[in-house]
């Protein structure tokens, strides 16, 4: 039985991994947290007390899996502060678009990280 989504993992070279860490901490608002001492380099980023995004360094000769580009669209985070995030994205020159789903009472912001992964922020506050 599936109980819920645990985390996403994004894998990249070391330089891109550092840039992704900075983006998800400074723009999305995740925080850097504890990560077990794995043999590989990486980070665990947290929303509150839950690790939700893992960043891992690609090993030297690891080939990119071609199907990944064709299947991944976006990750979604529950968020508060629609105006705060809209301003933050504008201030950082990050293109985004806004959407509403009145039937379920949500407002959404969609944008991309520095390597093109889609991000959705879902707001349910009135």
What are these language model-derived features?
Residues 31-66, 118-124:
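Conserved short beta-strand elements that form part of the metal-binding/catalytic scaffold
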Residues 25-33, 94-95:
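Conserved acetyl-CoA-binding loop of GNAT-fold acetyltransferases
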Residues 68-89:
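Mid-chain, well-packed structural core segment of small domains
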Residues 1-21, 73-75:
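N-terminal beta-strand motif that seeds the catalytic metal site of vicinal oxygen chelate
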Residues 38-42, 71, 103-107:
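Short acidic/glycine-enriched loop/turn segments that link adjacent beta-strands
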Residues 20-27, 89, 116:
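Conserved active-site tyrosine of GNAT-family acetyltransferases
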Residues 1-3, 90-126:
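Vicinal oxygen chelate
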